[in-house]
Amino acid sequence: MGLPWYRVHTVVLNDPGRLLAVHIMHTALVSGWAGSMALYELAVFDPSDPVLDPMWRQGMFVIPFMTRLGITDSWGGWSISGGTVTNPGIWSYEGVAGTHIVFSGLCFLAAIWHWVYWDLEIFSDERTGKPSLDLPKIFGIHLFLAGVACFGFGAFHVTGLYGPGIWVSDPYGLTGKVQAVNPAWGAEGFDPFVPGGIASHHIAAGTLGILAGLFHLSVRPPQRLYKGLRMGNIETVLSSSIAAVFFAAFVVAGTMWYGSATTPIELFGPTRYQWDQGYFQQEIYRRVSNGLAENLSLSEAWSKIPEKLAFYDYIGNNPAKGGLFRAGSMDNGDGIAVGWLGHPVFRDKEGRELFVRRMPTFFETFPVVLVDEEGIVRADVPFRRAESKYSVEQVGVTVEFYGGELNGVSYSDPATVKKYARRSQLGEIFELDRATLKSDGVFRSSPRGWFTFGHATFALLFFFGHIWHGARTLFRDVFAGIDPDLDAQVEFGTFQKVGDPTTRKQAA
């Protein structure tokens, strides 16, 4: 037939049986990939340190999605929260991976069956005997079924009525666990960080989908609308389906990058805006201030800061620090975090506490500047030592650590003080193991960054696909120069069935 690569899908244009077959095969590929990817990730995943080496530092992509839906245990005997389990049952990580692979195999067989037995009675128009699909009716059926699934997820799975619930955490990603969620029916349900909105929105959207599906099953479209929107043309379905997919892709790119209850930081890592706004730094200082108000010493107050919270306040966990072509996990970049060294407090010889100005997200290098509590520059690491007035040596800066591994240790020699000042630009200071994975020291993005980039990119491409196929179906008669209602369609790409020798042709 000699079709160019970009037109090969026209072979299923007027062939409902094989159109169904290729879609079932596509589902087989997607499900098979998901199951296989899950098994691969489980093979390389190290669950031993959920605090300093969580799934998102290891570059896991599908494990976080399973976890947010309620899967926490492995047949390997470990739990995502760090404990051990004895009988995880079928709904473990491996169980879910296996069910996807089994489902993929069944879809593969179903696709072959439908490819071989393509000429089914159900696809024929009773009056004409030609292949035909009642697209408005099919739309109603799919809308109804999608509504049932949506309602069921919100009313049963999320609420724990029949299911595990979903991953819920505190605003600082410290206490996350899978739990049942009650629907939020008030204004708070529209807050993207309130988990109850997930339940209520699925229940509401599912109800709407069920009602809309029943409407489209019981009410036929007016003839003018049917013809105007080309409801009899399968390319109309393609165009509107692409629209639904690219819209969803744009939405999830936003909820992933900006953060929401659906993308917990314990599973996908923090967002770049939490670094930009000093989100974790403010919480750490608030906790230290509260500790001091309770008559704790500075050392005791800092020692009470959870290592998990301190680790979030480190620029290496900012998903915007990765480069576009830097493949690999965060652990392959700056290394595997081993321990928190503690919080360094810098002071000049007058005893003023100095604060290192932190590196903004999009800088690779940044001057080391130390300011006092009023924001006045008191010390720096100069570029030109001959002209310096505020060098660490001249100002007499010292550093003392509170909390962490170096708790109570102080340094006054300039070389060491400058080393820790430079590291303080990057947030809290951690010991990182770069030898195990041969990490190169160059920051990588988290799965949050990869997911956002992929979905935003494909959403843009699919947007153009929607425009392209929408224009083709709306203006088919103009483009082809024929009346779409003619019985004999002989223009290329508009045969009743591609390659069908029975299509009437004009005499040469």
UniProtKB/Swiss-Prot annotation:
Q: Which UniProt keywords apply?
A: Chlorophyll, Chloroplast, Chromophore, Membrane, Photosynthesis, Photosystem II, Plastid, Thylakoid, Transmembrane, Transmembrane helix
UniProt GO molecular function: chlorophyll binding; electron transporter, transferring electrons within the cyclic electron transport pathway of photosynthesis activity
How this chain sits in the membrane, per its record, is:
Multi-pass membrane protein
Q: Which InterPro entries match?
A: PS_antenna-like, PS_II_antenna-like_sf, PSII_PsbB
Q: What does this protein do?
A: One of the components of the core complex of photosystem II (PSII). It binds chlorophyll and helps catalyze the primary light-induced photochemical processes of PSII. PSII is a light-driven water:plastoquinone oxidoreductase, using light energy to abstract electrons from H(2)O, generating O(2) and a proton gradient subsequently used for ATP formation.
Superkingdom as given in the UniProt entry:
Eukaryota
Q: Which organism is it from?
A: Triticum aestivum (Wheat)
Indicate the principal place this protein occupies in or around the cell. plastid
Note on how the cofactor is bound: Binds multiple chlorophylls. PSII binds additional chlorophylls, carotenoids and specific lipids.
Annotated compartments: Plastid, Chloroplast thylakoid membrane
The name on file for this protein is Photosystem II CP47 reaction center protein
